[in-house]
């Protein structure tokens, strides 16, 4: 019997499951939103929130623990320098799962988007904001 066993198996071996979740965490922290199936997103949420909580502690031991999962120095740096500070003063709830209406073609699996709740400004939006500011100053003068 499988009473009180936490985590989903996804019909994969332990090493495959660990690699899959590790890759999904890397993708979520890189792109800040990904499209996946609902059970995978629910499992990914706990892994990602634990890493963001480590980023809030921001000490050497936390960086080493994060590196064990991410295995990418650039991504660890981004997690601790960019993503972590966005959530200062928050008490969890760093990710959001949005269910999609259309299931996946082929196997009709329920799909969703998992994203960070406080996403970075898109570079296109920042560029548009900076180009509008000088134009407004020229009109005032």
UniProtKB/Swiss-Prot annotation:
Give the superkingdom in one word: Bacteria
What Gene Ontology cellular-component terms does the record carry? cytosolic large ribosomal subunit
- A Pfam family annotated for this UniProt entry: Ribosomal_L17
Q: Name one GO biological process term.
A: translation
Q: Does the keyword Transmembrane apply?
A: no
Family affiliation: Belongs to the bacterial ribosomal protein bL17 family.
Q: What is this protein called?
A: Large ribosomal subunit protein bL17
Its source organism is Maridesulfovibrio salexigens (strain ATCC 14822 / DSM 2638 / NCIMB 8403 / VKM B-1763) (Desulfovibrio salexigens)
Gene (UniProt) = rplQ
């Amino acid at each position: 019997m499988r009473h009180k066993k936490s985590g989903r198996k996804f019909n994969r071996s332990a090493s495959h499951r660990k690699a899959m979740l590790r890759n999904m965490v890397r993708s979520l922290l890189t792109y800040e939103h990904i499209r996946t199936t609902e059970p995978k997103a629910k499992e990914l949420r706990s892994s990602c929130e634990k890493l963001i909580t480590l980023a809030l502690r921001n000490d050497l031991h936390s960086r080493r623990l994060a590196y064990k999962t991410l295995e990418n120095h650039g991504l660890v740096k981004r997690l601790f320098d960019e993503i972590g500070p966005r959530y200062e003063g928050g008490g969890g709830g760093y990710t959001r799962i949005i269910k999609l209406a259309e299931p996946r073609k082929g196997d009709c699996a329920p799909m969703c988007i998992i994203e960070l709740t406080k996403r970075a400004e898109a570079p296109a939006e920042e560029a548009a904001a900076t180009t509008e500011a000088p134009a407004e100053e020229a009109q005032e003068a």
